[in-house]
C-alpha cells in the first residue's frame, strides 16, 4: 500500500486549485499508465493519494516516480517559490477488500491500511518511508532499491512506535 500527501498544499491559493489538481492527479494518472499493472485500487481526496498494489515492483516504481515528480520545477506556475514536496509511506500486510456503501464501490480496510496511513504524516518531506515489513520484502530480489533504518518512530495518532526505513533507488544518497 502507498499513501502520499502534499506538504504545503494549504499555500496553494483557491484560484490555482484547478492547476494543482491537473498537475497532481494528472501527473499520478500518467505515472500509473506507465506501470506494468495498474494498482488494484486507488483513491484520492484533496492533496492525498492512496493505492493498493498486487505487484511490489509497480508500487516501488510509482513511489520513486512520485517523489521525483515533486522535486522538479512542475509547481512554479502555482506561485510557490519554494515549491511543494510530497510525503510517501508504504506498508504491506493482509487487508479486507469490502464493498463500501457510501462510495458505491469496493474499498480496502483493516489494521495494515491504518498502519500505512499512520506512517505518512511522520515522513520527512520529499522522502519515502517504509515499514519493516516493506523493508523485509525489499531484501529479496529488488536490487534497484535500497533502504536505510531511520529509527523506531512514533506513528501519527498514537499508533505506537514502529521500526521505519527510508526508501531510495540503489546508489541514491539523501540526508536523513
Report residues per predicted region.
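Intrinsically disordered, glycine/charged-rich C-terminal tails and inter-domain linkers
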Residues: 125-176
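Catalytic NTP-binding/metal-coordinating core of nucleotidyl cyclase/transferase enzymes
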Residues: 1-65, 69
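Catalytic core of nucleotidyl cyclases, primarily class III adenylyl/guanylyl cyclases
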Residues: 33-58, 73-111
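Solvent-exposed polar/charged
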Residues: 34, 121-122, 140
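A generic structural signal for short hydrophobic patches within well-formed alpha-helices
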Residues: 9, 59, 95, 134-135
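Active-site phosphate/pyrophosphate- and oxyanion-stabilizing loops and adjacent acidic/basic residues
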Residues: 117
Amino acid at each position: 500500500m502507498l499513501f502520499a500527501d502534499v506538504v504545503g498544499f494549504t499555500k496553494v491559493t483557491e484560484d490555482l486549485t484547478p492547476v494543482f489538481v491537473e498537475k497532481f492527479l494528472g501527473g499520478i494518472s500518467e505515472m500509473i499508465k506507465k506501470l506494468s499493472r495498474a494498482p488494484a485500487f486507488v483513491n484520492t481526496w484533496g492533496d492525498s493519494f492512496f493505492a493498493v498494489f498486487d505487484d511490489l515492483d509497480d508500487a516501488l516504481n510509482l513511489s520513486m516516480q512520485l517523489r521525483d515528480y515533486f522535486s522538479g520545477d512542475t509547481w512554479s506556475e502555482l506561485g510557490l517559490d519554494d515549491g511543494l514536496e510530497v510525503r510517501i509511506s508504504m506498508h504491506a500486510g493482509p487487508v479486507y477488500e469490502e464493498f463500501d456503501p457510501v462510495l458505491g464501490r469496493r474499498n480496502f480496510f483493516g489494521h495494515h491500511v491504518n498502519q500505512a496511513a499512520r506512517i505518512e504524516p511522520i515522513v520527512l518531506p520529499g522522502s519515502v518511508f517504509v515499514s519493516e515489513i516493506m523493508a523485509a520484502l525489499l531484501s529479496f530480489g529488488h536490487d534497484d532499491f535500497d533502504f536505510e533504518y531511520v529509527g523506531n518512530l512514533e506513528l501519527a495518532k498514537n499508533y505506537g512506535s514502529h521500526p521505519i526505513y527510508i526508501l531510495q533507488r540503489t546508489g541514491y544518497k539523501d540526508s536523513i
